[in-house]
Amino acid sequence: MDDPDGNIELIRRIYGFDWAAVGKRADGFDRLRDLVSDDFQSQMSAELGGRTIGVDGLALFVEALEQDFSEFHYEAEEFIPGDGDKVVVAGRIRCVGRASKVPLSQEFGHVWTIADGTPTHVEAHMSRAEALSAAR
């Protein structure tokens, strides 16, 4: 059953801690594991490709980012109800290149799917517009 307000608050909790941050990852992924389904899946953006299964799979993907970035985190700016049990999160990725020390910023859009009050899937996009389109 659709509960847009409840779904948004649930997803907002996920972005309330920096689960992808370098140096904070272990605690962040423990907290993420408490909120999502055991078979949680992450679909990476078309530019990156790939899918991870479970929080451990997502953790391995994020760990690989540490090779390129000394800092990496998501800044969620908007939580938007999508169709059915979907929530769109739009914001910016902020990171710093490990070798170059250059700060980078990139728009992102995530489409979360919730089943029975538990997030089961997130689909990553490189823009708010792409995520909104995918959530319809």
What are these model-derived regions, one by one?
Residues F29-V87:
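A solvent-exposed, acidic/Ser-Thr-rich amphipathic alpha-helical stretch
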Residues A90-V96:
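Generic short beta-strand segments
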